[in-house]
Amino acid sequence: AIRRQRQMCIRDRNSTVDDAVTMIDTNVKGLLYVTKAVLPYMIDKNAGHIVNMGSTAGIYAYPGGAVYCATKAAVKTLSDGIRMDTIATDIKVTTIQPGIVETPFSEVRFHGDAEKAKAVYAGIDAIQPEDVADVVLYVTNQPKRLQISDVTIMANQQAAGFMVYKK
């Protein structure tokens, strides 16, 4: 479902509310369903680490991405709330907010237009999925006394949101 998810551009007459609902179902409700399923077990064991994947799009909105950006902002806010709700436990909650990561996301965003998707990464040494995985490993391998609540990672050529220098 995630790979078929289309970006909903509010100004685009061809985008539908169904596109937005799918995105909300995936990025927000999916997070809620999984958290609700695993959190009781974590509470019973007084241990665990929830790592939610946000995006710099949740910090810096960009044109044509209103709904996607809102769902990623919701990931951060939900994570903060879950952290507050579990403060009396040893459960950790981390939000990782990557910038431009070279994934199939752009192809989905541009409705299968591979050339347009490829252009997103042209001239930039984008973050790779393995880089994000390394950050997940880092935050989850900290001592019990330490919780990393938020991590924002960007390519060296990305200053903020969609502000990217292309060579």
What is each stretch, according to the model?
Residues 55:
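Residue(s) in the substrate-gating loop at a strand-loop-helix junction
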